[in-house]
């Protein structure tokens, strides 16, 4: 009702008990008379129209106007009243005809009484007794006490109430069935839709099952008690048990899809899309769990920096989450290029393994599931392109072409000064914010003498000239100022700051003071390692700065072009074949690249001459096969591609001749200086790295076959190179390709030239 039924009017209070003599026919007549006396344009509230009703005109038989009015008030209390009187009378007529229909079914005098639950039986039995013992208690307090007493009852006493309830419940069900037979017109069976029931989620299936089990043990439990008891159990289920319900839910969904498609064919008027039928009942976590048990591989980190962070964070559980990424970034910067390269190779290997495992996983899936997994992989790749991590941003920018991008303005002298001094100020004044730090640096710049400013202005001029000389296709942002060199104390602090922050509960000021005291009390012998690292960092800074001032090497003409389907160059001699075999089986992966090459040279010296001949024959056979495949591939090219390939080979030979000059050693030095300018390229491909190793193997192998000490030669060459094999892969590819072309003309020419190169190296040393 709308609330008015709870506040009886004076007429309702005065209703005589004799009103019971109204029959159904009399009440319908009353309503008909009222309907006939309504105004033609009845649009007012029913109370307004009711107050203007002439009840004497409504009176009929021996029912007076007042009696009719009282009866109307009684009937109108049974229906909602926020409508016009015309509408209200129609509803009242329906109520008079079927007073016990629908929700009012239980009000029928013959309707069987529902049995009390075991708890209510106990409550009704004990309430009077406890009310006498505790008259000061309210009904709420009594209910709480009796509820607690019932829970404390032994099972034997509880069983008495449970058995009485079950007996009366069976009797109630029999009486209800009899009532339905006797009064079929009163049962309002809502016409149920014949649309198939939607499939349940794994959690819903589990809850339905567990609820039945729970009610068998505690039949008197309320719905709230069942929910409270089972609510948290689903999240605590083991993966194996959760998987059981996931499989059941998937089976149910499959059945639903088949039934639903048949239903849609029979009812084409329904507007149900295919997406609505095939909608998954699994959550993201449940889907991932199923995929994991089906053998779907875990996606590896996207780049070497992410891989390093993932490994480092596993041991940083005590460090606050806000500090972890900062520490990871600092530790990453402390790694040498060789260590970063190792992580890059490891990351690339994980990606390759993932692709192989993913293909194997896809083969085991039906076509629909394959499409789903491929769709998820595609979305992940799209998201990666849209949001790049700080670690992956730099390589992607370096590897991209700059022709379509707007060139950046070179940095100013003041900016160079600020970047150089900012880190030192941050350590000395950690309480300053970024904006305060910037203002302080600006004041310091203004206070500098013109002589000191001239040094930074010279750098600015060099960077500006560099920017003007920079070609459109050159690698991105050579004019960026290199990172300032760190002092020994700064490098040490970055390596231990995590421990100090944990000790001082993330209080950075206290941690910095403690680190400063520890550093001052350290012996020189303990500081020596950090002093060496600082010296290396200073050399790195000076080298990068000199590279920025130097004009960029012209690499566009010698940049390796990729031709689809071009056969890969095989080893050119026995030593290179031997090296490739050792490198590919992973036996030496634990060694750094420099030591790895020395070890390969040493092993080559130890094997017998017959084994060397065996590797030489294998290499010669692969060279013959390569020539055949290369000829077939060149013939298969279109005329335009063939012409482009020949032009590329011709230009490459000319460029390599210019770069190498008469002395092979000087050419290698030239290439090395060029490669040093791009040593931070973290996104080089692993195949190019292998070719770089093969190039060194080739030189070492030739010298070994000529009787030279391969390991010694390799060590000397690498020590002269100076940067632990951080050669640019593209340049190494060019050397490989040049050797490859020359080898097509004469198999032994490359070997002899390499031998002469090594001999000259040895002579110069």
From Swiss-Prot:
<feature type="region of interest" description="Disordered">
    <location>
        <begin position="649"/>
        <end position="765"/>
    </location>
</feature>
<dbReference type="GO" id="GO:0000183">
    <property type="term" value="P:rDNA heterochromatin formation"/>
</dbReference>
<dbReference type="GO" id="GO:0003682">
    <property type="term" value="F:chromatin binding"/>
</dbReference>
<feature type="DNA-binding region" description="HMG box 1">
    <location>
        <begin position="112"/>
        <end position="180"/>
    </location>
</feature>
<feature type="modified residue" description="Phosphothreonine">
    <location>
        <position position="201"/>
    </location>
</feature>
<feature type="compositionally biased region" description="Polar residues">
    <location>
        <begin position="664"/>
        <end position="674"/>
    </location>
</feature>
<feature type="region of interest" description="Disordered">
    <location>
        <begin position="1"/>
        <end position="21"/>
    </location>
</feature>
<protein>
    <recommendedName>
        <fullName>Nucleolar transcription factor 1</fullName>
    </recommendedName>
</protein>
<feature type="DNA-binding region" description="HMG box 5">
    <location>
        <begin position="482"/>
        <end position="549"/>
    </location>
</feature>
<dbReference type="Pfam" id="PF09011">
    <property type="entry name" value="HMG_box_2"/>
</dbReference>
<feature type="modified residue" description="Phosphoserine">
    <location>
        <position position="584"/>
    </location>
</feature>
<feature type="modified residue" description="Phosphoserine">
    <location>
        <position position="435"/>
    </location>
</feature>
<dbReference type="GO" id="GO:0006362">
    <property type="term" value="P:transcription elongation by RNA polymerase I"/>
</dbReference>
<feature type="compositionally biased region" description="Basic and acidic residues">
    <location>
        <begin position="457"/>
        <end position="487"/>
    </location>
</feature>
<feature type="modified residue" description="Phosphoserine">
    <location>
        <position position="638"/>
    </location>
</feature>
<feature type="DNA-binding region" description="HMG box 3">
    <location>
        <begin position="298"/>
        <end position="362"/>
    </location>
</feature>
<feature type="DNA-binding region" description="HMG box 2">
    <location>
        <begin position="196"/>
        <end position="264"/>
    </location>
</feature>
<dbReference type="Pfam" id="PF14887">
    <property type="entry name" value="HMG_box_5"/>
</dbReference>
<dbReference type="GO" id="GO:0005730">
    <property type="term" value="C:nucleolus"/>
</dbReference>
<feature type="modified residue" description="N-acetylmethionine">
    <location>
        <position position="1"/>
    </location>
</feature>
<feature type="modified residue" description="Phosphoserine">
    <location>
        <position position="495"/>
    </location>
</feature>
<feature type="modified residue" description="Phosphoserine">
    <location>
        <position position="546"/>
    </location>
</feature>
<comment type="subunit">
    <text>Homodimer. Part of Pol I pre-initiation complex (PIC), in which Pol I core assembles with RRN3 and promoter-bound UTBF and SL1/TIF-IB complex. Interacts with TOP2A in the context of Pol I complex. Interacts with TBP. Interacts with TAF1A. Interacts with RASL11A. Binds to IRS1 and PIK3CA. Interacts with DHX33. Interacts with PHF6. Interacts with CEBPA (isoform 1 and isoform 4). Interacts with DDX11. Interacts with NOP53. Interacts with ALKBH2.</text>
</comment>
<dbReference type="InterPro" id="IPR029215">
    <property type="entry name" value="HMG_box_5"/>
</dbReference>
<feature type="modified residue" description="Phosphoserine">
    <location>
        <position position="412"/>
    </location>
</feature>
<keyword id="KW-0010">Activator</keyword>
<feature type="compositionally biased region" description="Low complexity">
    <location>
        <begin position="747"/>
        <end position="765"/>
    </location>
</feature>
<keyword id="KW-0539">Nucleus</keyword>
<feature type="compositionally biased region" description="Basic and acidic residues">
    <location>
        <begin position="370"/>
        <end position="379"/>
    </location>
</feature>
<dbReference type="InterPro" id="IPR051762">
    <property type="entry name" value="UBF1"/>
</dbReference>
<feature type="DNA-binding region" description="HMG box 6">
    <location>
        <begin position="568"/>
        <end position="634"/>
    </location>
</feature>
<keyword id="KW-0677">Repeat</keyword>
<keyword id="KW-0804">Transcription</keyword>
<feature type="modified residue" description="Phosphoserine">
    <location>
        <position position="484"/>
    </location>
</feature>
<feature type="region of interest" description="Disordered">
    <location>
        <begin position="370"/>
        <end position="411"/>
    </location>
</feature>
<keyword id="KW-0597">Phosphoprotein</keyword>
<dbReference type="InterPro" id="IPR009071">
    <property type="entry name" value="HMG_box_dom"/>
</dbReference>
<feature type="DNA-binding region" description="HMG box 4">
    <location>
        <begin position="407"/>
        <end position="475"/>
    </location>
</feature>
<keyword id="KW-0007">Acetylation</keyword>
<feature type="modified residue" description="Phosphoserine">
    <location>
        <position position="273"/>
    </location>
</feature>
<dbReference type="GO" id="GO:0045943">
    <property type="term" value="P:positive regulation of transcription by RNA polymerase I"/>
</dbReference>
<dbReference type="GO" id="GO:0003677">
    <property type="term" value="F:DNA binding"/>
</dbReference>
């Amino acid at each position: 009702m709308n609330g008015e039924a709870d506040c009886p009017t004076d007429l309702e209070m005065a209703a005589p008990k004799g009103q019971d003599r109204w029959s159904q026919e009399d009440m319908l007549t009353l309503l008909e008379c009222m309907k006939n006396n309504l105004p033609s344009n009845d649009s007012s509230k029913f109370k307004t129209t009711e107050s203007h009703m002439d009840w004497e005109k409504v009176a009929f038989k021996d029912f007076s106007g007042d009696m009719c009015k009282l009866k109307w008030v009684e009937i109108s209390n049974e229906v909602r009243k926020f409508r016009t009187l015309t509408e209200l009378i129609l509803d009242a007529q329906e109520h008079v005809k079927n007073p016990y229909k629908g929700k009012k079914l239980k009000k029928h005098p013959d309707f069987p009484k529902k049995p009390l639950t075991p708890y209510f039986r106990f409550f009704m039995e004990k309430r009077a007794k406890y009310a006498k013992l505790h008259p000061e208690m309210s009904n709420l307090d009594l209910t709480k006490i009796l509820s607690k007493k019932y829970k404390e009852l032994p099972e034997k006493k509880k069983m008495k109430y449970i058995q009485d309830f079950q007996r009366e419940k069976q009797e109630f069900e029999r009486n209800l069935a009899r009532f339905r037979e006797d009064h079929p017109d009163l049962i309002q069976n809502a016409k149920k839709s014949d649309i198939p029931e939607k499939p349940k989620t794994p959690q819903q299936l589990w809850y339905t099952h567990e609820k039945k089990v729970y009610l068998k043990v505690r039949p008197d439990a309320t719905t709230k008690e069942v929910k409270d008891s089972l609510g948290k159990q689903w999240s605590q289920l083991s993966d194996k048990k959760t998987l059981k319900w996931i499989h059941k839910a998937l089976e149910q969904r499959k059945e639903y899809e088949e039934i639903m498609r048949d239903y849609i064919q029979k009812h084409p008027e329904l507007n149900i899309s295919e997406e609505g039928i095939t909608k998954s009942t699994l959550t993201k976590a449940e889907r991932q769990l199923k995929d994991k048990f089906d053998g779907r591989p875990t996606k590896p980190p996207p780049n070497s920096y992410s891989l390093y962070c993932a490994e480092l964070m596993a041991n940083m559980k005590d460090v606050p989450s806000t500090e972890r990424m900062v520490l990871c970034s600092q530790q990453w910067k402390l790694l040498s290029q060789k260590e970063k390269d190792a992580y890059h190779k490891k990351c690339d290997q994980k990606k390759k393994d993932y692709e192989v495992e993913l293909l194997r996983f896809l083969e085991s899936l039906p076509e629909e599931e394959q499409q789903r997994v491929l769709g998820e992989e595609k979305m992940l790749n799209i998201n990666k392109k849209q949001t790049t991590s700080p670690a992956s941003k730099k390589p992607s920018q370096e590897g991209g072409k700059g022709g379509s991008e707007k060139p950046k303005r070179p940095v100013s002298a003041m900016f160079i000064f600020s970047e150089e001094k900012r880190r030192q100020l941050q350590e000395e004044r950690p309480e300053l914010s970024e904006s305060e730090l910037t203002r302080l640096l600006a004041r310091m710049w203004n206070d500098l003498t013109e002589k000191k400013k001239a040094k930074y202005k010279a750098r600015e001029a060099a960077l500006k000239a560099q920017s003007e000389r920079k070609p459109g296709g050159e690698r991105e942002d050579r004019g960026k100022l290199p990172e300032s060199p760190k002092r020994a104390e700064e490098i040490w602090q970055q390596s231990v700051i995590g421990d100090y922050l944990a000790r001082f509960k993330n209080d950075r000021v206290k941690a910095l003071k403690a680190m400063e005291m520890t550093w001052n009390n350290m012996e020189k012998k303990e500081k020596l390692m950090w002093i060496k690292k600082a010296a290396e960092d200073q050399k790195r800074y000076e080298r990068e700065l000199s590279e920025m001032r130097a004009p960029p090497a012209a690499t566009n003409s010698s940049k390796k072009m990729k031709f689809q389907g071009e056969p890969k160059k095989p080893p050119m001699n026995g030593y290179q074949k031997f090296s490739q075999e050792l490198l590919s089986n992973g036996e030496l992966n634990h060694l750094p690249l420099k030591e790895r090459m020395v070890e390969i040279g040493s092993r080559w010296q130890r094997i017998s001459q017959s084994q060397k001949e065996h590797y030489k024959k294998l290499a010669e056979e692969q060279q013959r096969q390569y020539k055949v495949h290369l000829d077939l591939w060149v013939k298969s090219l279109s005329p335009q591609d063939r012409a482009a390939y020949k032009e590329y080979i011709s230009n490459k030979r000319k460029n390599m001749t210019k770069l190498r000059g008469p002395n092979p050693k000087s050419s290698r030095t030239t290439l090395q200086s060029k490669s040093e300018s791009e040593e931070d390229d973290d996104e080089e491909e692993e195949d190019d790295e292998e070719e770089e190793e093969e190039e060194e193997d080739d030189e070492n192998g030739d010298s070994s076959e000529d009787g030279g000490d391969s390991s010694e030669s390799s060590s000397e060459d690498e020590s002269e190179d100076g940067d632990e094999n951080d050669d640019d892969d593209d340049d190494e590819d060019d050397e490989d390709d040049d050797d490859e072309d020359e080898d097509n003309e004469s198999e032994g020419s490359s070997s002899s030239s390499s031998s002469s190169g090594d001999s000259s190296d040895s002579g110069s040393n």
